[in-house]
Amino acid sequence: MKPSVILYKKIADDLRARLDQHFTVTELDAFPSLDHPALATAEGIIGSGGKVDKDFLQHAPRLRAASTISVGYDTFNVDALNEKGVILMHTPTVLTETVADTVLALMLASARRVVEVAERVKAGEWKGGVDSDWFGTDVHHKTIGILGMGRIGLAVAQRAHFGFSMPVLYNARRHHAEAEQRFNARHCDLDTLLAESDFLCITLPLTTETHHLIGREQLAKMKPSAILINIGRGAVVDEDALTEALVKGTIQGAGLDVFVKEPLPVDSPLLDLPNVVALPHIGSATHETRYDMAACAVDNLIAALSGEVKENCVNPQVLK
């Protein structure tokens, strides 16, 4: 008898067919409510979004594996999963290059004021030659500081170094030999990163250690001409402090793909600022990469429920 699983995100037909080969699938339009009858027999879940905590696990007594179609897993209570012996799988490798592209897009859009200037053109403000009121700042040869040198940080460093001749600084728990050898990247402490970076690029996940890592004190240490880019998690940055810094000119601008609350509320003060480029968490949102992420998540669930996990496991200790 095939294991029962819940699919709570639309995926391509061929990937759905692959799930059907291995499992009895209940497909839902959204994350299952706690009283959904399918939870009682589900051995696996696959999708993105939704809060998996102790309460959820109590309503899913047979759950053995969760496969998220994402690299981030901050909506999962990993300790609770470990306690119940539930395997958590994610998709850390397939989205690296696409998210790094998004970082560069945010850097360019913020520095050259692309969104702001395009809106002015649409509003009929382009009457003739442009003066300094329309100018932006260069990206090439500026210093990029990368906070978190994982896969995405490394891909950003590659683009910055080879594409824009940018000196690369980074802050991470340990030295990254490849970044230092290939891109002449320099490991430094956080204060140095803040003080010397023209672009501060945050690629960190959200943990208890990274929550509000960048706050009012840290923003005050940045250059007035600096631009902050965040494609990690929203709560790594204190949004109130960031808003204040952008209003006061403590820093020049921000390019943001992630926020504390998503979707970003329409009354967020960040949306009123011309020096903010705000995206709807689309760092990996290309047709190609989203397909690859779903395919990876399907393979992950099959591996987890067949006892053949070799990679992409968040909590490998439960495999022992």
From Swiss-Prot:
Keyword Ubl conjugation: no
Enzyme class: oxidoreductase
Any GO MF annotation of the entry: glyoxylate reductase (NADPH) activity
Catalytic activity: glycolate + NADP(+) = glyoxylate + NADPH + H(+); (R)-glycerate + NAD(+) = 3-hydroxypyruvate + NADH + H(+); (R)-glycerate + NADP(+) = 3-hydroxypyruvate + NADPH + H(+)
Signal peptide start and end residues: none
EC number: 1.1.1.79, 1.1.1.81
InterPro entries: D-isomer_2-hydroxyacid_DH, D-isomer_2_OHA_DH_cat_dom, D-isomer_DH_CS, D-isomer_DH_NAD-bd, Glyo/OHPyrv_Rdtase_B, NAD(P)-bd_dom_sf
Protein name, UniProt field: Glyoxylate/hydroxypyruvate reductase B
Gene that this polypeptide is encoded by: ghrB
